[in-house]
Amino acid sequence: MIVIGDIHAEYTQYLKLLSRYPGQSSVQIGDFGIGFRQVPELPEGAWFFRGNHDNPELAREHPHYLGDYGVRELDGVKFFWVSGAWSIDQQYRTEGVSWWRDEELSYAELEQAVDLYEKERPDLVLTHDGPNVATDFILNRYSLHKTKPIPTRTGQALDAMWSIHHPKKWIFGHWHVNWKQEIEGTEFRCLGELGWCEVNKEKK
């Protein structure tokens, strides 16, 4: 299974990447760009969930949308995912055109997602943003912001998940850097724009 970072409606490059892996499933982990440009026909097995730069309504209507959160198995790889994030640049965007008020899941939806996470205790987690234990490393290493971004309900939910259970792998995007580090037994990986990685079924 291929996991792909933010593409921001760069569909030509996205489809070119998918063509290198015919027959393999893929999951694009948010900031797909739906709502900014017409989405081309996607190959079978190409899935995505939304980030903070996606139109939530259009995403939910698309046949290749995984859903807002849940558990799925593709190519023998089982994973848990959560959509959405908070936009630090929303003051520069236009509501309903380039920014959507429901970019994050609601508190109730996130609470349900945390409950499902606790029940499933997954080995692999895919999210658009990452928990603070990982994003703090990125902020410090790359000096992305002079001040730490404000706490968000998505971030708080991801932190709650991390406190409940440490998965083997956690892959996210949002921060536009390629970064990987093991923290307390979890291999965290941030995918940059059009970054990707392959996740294989674990051998028993």
Regions found by a protein language model. Name each.
Residues 3-5, 26-31, 46-53, 66-67, ...:
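Active-site neighborhood of phospho(di)ester-bond hydrolases with catalytic His/Asp-centered motifs
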Residues 72-76, 159-164, 176-204:
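Binuclear metal-dependent phosphoesterase catalytic core
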Residues 20-21, 42-44, 141-145, 187-189:
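Glycine-rich, phosphate-binding/catalytic loops in enzymes
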Residues 2-75, 152-155:
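Core catalytic region of metal-dependent phosphoesterases/phosphodiesterases
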Residues 10-12, 35-37, 56-58, 72-75, ...:
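Short catalytic/ligand-binding loop motif for oxyanion handling, primarily in non-cytosolic enzymes
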